[in-house]
């Protein structure tokens, strides 16, 4: 199997993780009981961490190096390889722990924003925003 096709399998796995995050996020906004927030934040953090680890893994980087040296078959494949290189370079700059903490904080912040907006009380959301921006 070519390096490009092996990369496609990894990207598919990352897509499964991120699309699962999207479903959990939608559930949080529509049906999730408020008492499930802490567990949902842990779920989101876990999935985000797994996707980040997979994207920045040594295996993925080695396959990308190989895919760049093997001539991609089509212009779209070449664009995919360039885009993946950009994504990996960006992701490598962020420590895994920070990525997971940001995900967990954002999940809590989203719930706080909904409550603060319903009560027209921004002070309920301010600490979450401050933490996200720090």
Regions found by a protein language model. Give the residues of each.
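A well-structured
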Residues: 1-134
């Amino acid at each position: 199997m070519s390096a490009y096709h092996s990369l496609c399998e990894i990207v598919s796995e990352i897509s499964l993780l991120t699309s699962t995050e999207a479903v959990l996020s939608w559930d949080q906004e529509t049906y999730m009981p408020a008492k499930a927030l802490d567990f949902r934040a842990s779920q989101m953090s876990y999935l985000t961490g797994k996707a980040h680890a997979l994207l920045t893994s040594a295996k993925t980087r080695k396959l990308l190096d190989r895919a760049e040296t093997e001539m991609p078959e089509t212009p779209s494949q070449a664009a995919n390889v360039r885009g993946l290189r950009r994504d990996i370079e960006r992701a490598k700059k962020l420590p895994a722990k920070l990525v997971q903490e940001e995900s967990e904080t954002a999940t809590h912040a989203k719930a706080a924003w909904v409550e603060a907006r319903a009560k027209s009380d921004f002070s309920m959301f301010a600490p979450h925003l401050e933490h996200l921006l720090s």
